[in-house]
């Protein structure tokens, strides 16, 4: 949830700069990660659980793209980019491990 809160703070900054298109995109993908992880907790079976985690992983990958774009275009400082990207990378690693474990337990 902390990552999503940081993304929402970034969205607020971007909207103050009237960058609504990219703000909306990173807002959707960045907050969707946690929402899909939360949904996975109440999945209707193993396949649904894996599906929700894979969706969260896709959203984390998309968020990484938006973070890089914002940094390269000057909207995100190197310090802010590194902080958010490190957290996003950690989320991706956790999701990959969780999906792989769940798939292994599926057999």
Language-model segments: residues:
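Short, C-terminally biased terminal segments at protein or domain edges
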Residues: 1-107
């Amino acid at each position: 949830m902390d990552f999503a809160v940081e993304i929402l703070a970034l969205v607020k900054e971007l909207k103050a700069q009237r960058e609504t298109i990219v703000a909306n995109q990173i807002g959707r993908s960045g907050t969707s990660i946690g929402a899909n992880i939360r949904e996975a907790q109440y999945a209707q079976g193993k396949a649904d659980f894996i599906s929700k985690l894979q969706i969260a992983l896709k959203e984390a990958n998309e968020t990484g793209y938006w973070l890089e774009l914002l940094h390269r275009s000057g909207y995100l400082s190197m310090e802010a980019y590194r902080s958010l990207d490190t957290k996003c990378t950690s989320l991706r690693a956790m999701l990959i491990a969780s999906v792989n474990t769940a798939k292994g337990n599926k057999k």
